Amino acid sequence: YMNFNFAKATNSRLMGSLGLIINWIDDENNHFCQYFLLDAEGLGLADYVSLNNPTQEEAYMEEERLMGGFGSDRVELTKDESLFLVSYFGNKNFYYDKLLPGDKCEYIDIIKNYKTDLTIEKLYNKICKRVDEEVEFINYMTMRFIAWDRESLKYFSGSDEIANMHITNINGTLLKNVVSDKGQGRYISNVPF
């Protein structure tokens, strides 16, 4: 029987994706490590790998493969938070009719049966980096508009109307964004995509 040992995730939700690691341990100190790539822009669980009793180097290499490219901090999560994320993003796969990645028998029970009072909004402070600068906030929200990320737009605006606005007919890719300060708290965002 495996017991929860620890979990951590990147705080990169504002970029549309995050990495999640859940580490389990049994009474004989055997480790089972689960690595999930969570995609909020329509894929749900985008990638999954597991390692049984990895060496420290193997675990580190897989963590860096999953999380290194985000350039984000890694934050500790509780068992409840980490299992909620697997269930939440895994259910997106069903909603968008996308295949579950990797050996789904290792996590399908979490998706189908894990129950909690958590909501994705309750986790935003952990899974999103703190944004202190106005231009940085504009850049992130521009990315969310182009990606049709209604969930983030609703969270940050508090408005269904803004969350349902879009500037592309399908999820787009942001190529560049130039933000000009026009003074008095006004900005112009010039965006080729």
Kindly give the residue locations of the regions a language model identified.
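Non-catalytic terminal/accessory regions
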Residues: 1-193
